[in-house]
Amino acid sequence: MAKQSMKAREVKRVALADKYFAKRAELKAIISDVNATDEDRWNAVLKLQTLPRDSSPSRQRNRCRQTGRPHAFLRKFGLSRIKVREAAMRGEIPGLKKASW
């Protein structure tokens, strides 16, 4: 199990990313606009750097819904490989069965 503080930190990152999404997209559009002046583009870079670090979506980490485990996360189920295996062995995931060949 992940520490509660790590789970809370991840929730905070998601909230910050949602809050600053529009502003971040606006600044990135200015930066990538070739018709904008160099001064405007540089000012946009500086403003982007002043935004909170955790407001960047790339700082988010997928975590298991049950345990908070950050590694071996399966997007299809929203769980770590360990919890997917446990649920599959109990027959709780429809259509999923153990491979045999």
UniProtKB/Swiss-Prot annotation:
<comment type="subunit">
    <text>Part of the 30S ribosomal subunit. Contacts proteins S3 and S10.</text>
</comment>
<protein>
    <recommendedName>
        <fullName>Small ribosomal subunit protein uS14</fullName>
    </recommendedName>
</protein>
<dbReference type="InterPro" id="IPR023036">
    <property type="entry name" value="Ribosomal_uS14_bac/plastid"/>
</dbReference>
<keyword id="KW-0699">rRNA-binding</keyword>
<keyword id="KW-0694">RNA-binding</keyword>
<comment type="similarity">
    <text>Belongs to the universal ribosomal protein uS14 family.</text>
</comment>
<dbReference type="GO" id="GO:0003735">
    <property type="term" value="F:structural constituent of ribosome"/>
</dbReference>
<dbReference type="GO" id="GO:0006412">
    <property type="term" value="P:translation"/>
</dbReference>
<dbReference type="GO" id="GO:0019843">
    <property type="term" value="F:rRNA binding"/>
</dbReference>
<dbReference type="GO" id="GO:0015935">
    <property type="term" value="C:small ribosomal subunit"/>
</dbReference>
<keyword id="KW-0689">Ribosomal protein</keyword>
<dbReference type="Pfam" id="PF00253">
    <property type="entry name" value="Ribosomal_S14"/>
</dbReference>
<comment type="function">
    <text>Binds 16S rRNA, required for the assembly of 30S particles and may also be responsible for determining the conformation of the 16S rRNA at the A site.</text>
</comment>
<keyword id="KW-0687">Ribonucleoprotein</keyword>
<dbReference type="GO" id="GO:0005737">
    <property type="term" value="C:cytoplasm"/>
</dbReference>
<dbReference type="InterPro" id="IPR018271">
    <property type="entry name" value="Ribosomal_uS14_CS"/>
</dbReference>
<dbReference type="InterPro" id="IPR001209">
    <property type="entry name" value="Ribosomal_uS14"/>
</dbReference>
